[in-house]
């Protein structure tokens, strides 16, 4: 019986699923926003949120745990130097999933996953038309 098994398999082997979620988490932490399918986005939330919670307390043990889960030093540095202090006062809910229609090829439901309270990119002034 399949009672209380909450993990989505995403039609992949366990190694493939783990590697895919690790890569997606690294991409989300680096760029702070990615586009993916809705089921992947919902699973990604379960990976990224505990990482940011770890980064809120910058101990050596937490850095080692984060590196063990991400396997990327740049991602760990951004987590502990940038995201941990940013979300220090927030008690969870660091990601936002926005549904954005369906993919053209296979009609898969797509979503935009972003970190909340991320700094907006600086808007460039419109170029003046020279005559």
Curated annotation (Swiss-Prot):
Q: Name one Pfam family in it.
A: Ribosomal_L17
Keywords for this entry?
Ribonucleoprotein, Ribosomal protein
Q: Where is the signal peptide?
A: none
Lineage, top-rank taxon, reads Bacteria
Q: Which residues form a coiled coil?
A: none
**GO BP annotations listed:** translation
Asked if the record carries the keyword Ribonucleoprotein, the reply is yes
Is Iron-sulfur one of the keywords? no
Task: Give a Gene Ontology cellular component term annotated to this protein.
Answer: cytosolic large ribosomal subunit
**Entry's family note:** Belongs to the bacterial ribosomal protein bL17 family.
Tell me the protein's name: Large ribosomal subunit protein bL17
- Which species is this UniProt entry from? Methylibium petroleiphilum (strain ATCC BAA-1232 / LMG 22953 / PM1)
- Highest classification ranks of the organism: Bacteria, Pseudomonadati, Pseudomonadota, Betaproteobacteria, Burkholderiales
**Gene from which the chain derives:** rplQ
């Amino acid at each position: 019986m399949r009672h209380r098994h909450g993990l989505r398999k995403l039609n992949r082997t366990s190694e493939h699923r783990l590697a895919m979620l690790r890569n997606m988490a690294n991409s989300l932490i680096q760029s702070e926003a990615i586009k993916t399918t809705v089921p992947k986005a919902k699973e990604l939330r379960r990976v990224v949120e505990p990482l940011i919670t770890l980064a809120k307390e910058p101990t050596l043990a937490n850095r080692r745990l984060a590196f063990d889960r991400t396997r990327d030093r740049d991602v760990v540095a951004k987590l502990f130097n940038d995201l941990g202090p940013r979300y220090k006062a927030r008690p969870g809910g660091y990601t936002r999933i926005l549904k954005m229609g369906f993919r053209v090829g296979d009609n898969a439901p797509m979503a935009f996953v972003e970190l909340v309270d991320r700094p907006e990119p600086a808007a460039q002034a419109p170029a003046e038309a020279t005559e």
